[in-house]
Every structure is written in structure tokens, then in C-alpha cells.
């Protein structure tokens, strides 16, 4: 794969709605090019006989069983709330 161009960096920045300067675009072009070049080195590895994996370790589901449990009583929760009304925690408005 060829190195990434400055136009590609600017295009990705535009898609991500990032305002970048010319200096930043040049820096990111160099940095991304180095990253791509480093990743391309993986193509040179001999993977003959290596089975594809999705995890480095042979792990199964390590999560605990999901069991429903009783929560705190509403009264105890409201004791910790700075403001409440009608059994609901009141928070500052986030919409105008």
C-alpha cells in the first residue's frame, strides 16, 4: 500500500469535523504513513500453520452469571440525591 497523502488526511479530518492546520495535516500525514508502514510489516510474518484467533489467550466467557438482585430502596436512593420530587431525582435541565 502506498503512503497516505495529505489530501487523504484532510479528507478524513473533514469527515470527522476536525479543523486542522496545514502544519497538523503535514504532521498527521507523516505519522499515519509511519503507522501504515509499520502495519505492513505484519504481512511479512510467516503465519503458515498458525490458526486464526480472535483472542490472544484461549478464553471462554469469563463474565459472571447475570442474576437479578434487589436494588436499594427508593427512600435510600433519594437520601443521597441533592434534589428530588415525587420519588424522582431532579437534575439540572440540559435542553433549552
Curated annotation (Swiss-Prot):
Source organism, top-level taxon: Bacteria
Catalytic reaction(s) noted: L-glutamyl-tRNA(Gln) + L-glutamine + ATP + H2O = L-glutaminyl-tRNA(Gln) + L-glutamate + ADP + phosphate + H(+); L-aspartyl-tRNA(Asn) + L-glutamine + ATP + H2O = L-asparaginyl-tRNA(Asn) + L-glutamate + ADP + phosphate + 2 H(+)
Any Pfam family: GatC
EC number of this enzyme: 6.3.5.-
Keyword line: ATP-binding, Ligase, Nucleotide-binding, Protein biosynthesis
Keyword field contains Cell wall biogenesis/degradation: no
GO biological process: glutaminyl-tRNAGln biosynthesis via transamidation; regulation of translational fidelity; translation
Keyword ATP-binding among record annotations: yes
InterPro entries, sorted: Asp/Glu-ADT_sf_sub_c, GatC
EC class of the enzyme, as a word: ligase
Assigned protein family: Belongs to the GatC family.
Protein name: Glutamyl-tRNA(Gln) amidotransferase subunit C
Gene name linked to the record: gatC
